[in-house]
Amino acid sequence: ELNVFGNKYNITKDGLNEFYENYKKHVFENNKEAYIVERQLDNGKIAIDLDFRYNSSITEKQHTNDHISDFIELCMNGFNDLFLEMNNKPISFYIFEKENVNCLDNVTKDGIHIIINIIADFSTKLLFRKYILENIEDIWAELPLENDWNSVVDEAVMKGNAGWQLYGSRKP
């Protein structure tokens, strides 16, 4: 038994950096486990949760680094198409994925979490998601997915309705 209990915290913007520093020390320096889920903020960085579902006979990752590069290019095209002015600021993509797929009895799960250093409100994030959905099949049609694109590109995270596991945290 893990002896892990749920709780809810409201960390102010002023305290967020201190929280992240303490979290980093706890997880990455002291090698301790954490089980933290956070909500995406309105006027926060763009977070994209890509959930892949495959037939249970699949036991290895189906996407490659080329798929990820193509997705980043799709996003950059979306920024250029949707937003008039990006102020020539550098755009960073932080890509997070597990090393292996998760093989269950009836489905194989995989996915990618992406954080982009662009601040946007929820309505802008949803507009960006719509752009992704309209174009993603052009780059990833060959992936043998069992789920549709609407469920691949998780809407709840971009609306702020779902938790996002903090990097380094795990499920209990």
Give the positions of each predicted feature.
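Structured partner-binding subdomains within large eukaryotic complex subunits
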Residues: 148-172
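Signature for HUH/AEP ssDNA processing cores
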Residues: 1-147, 164, 170
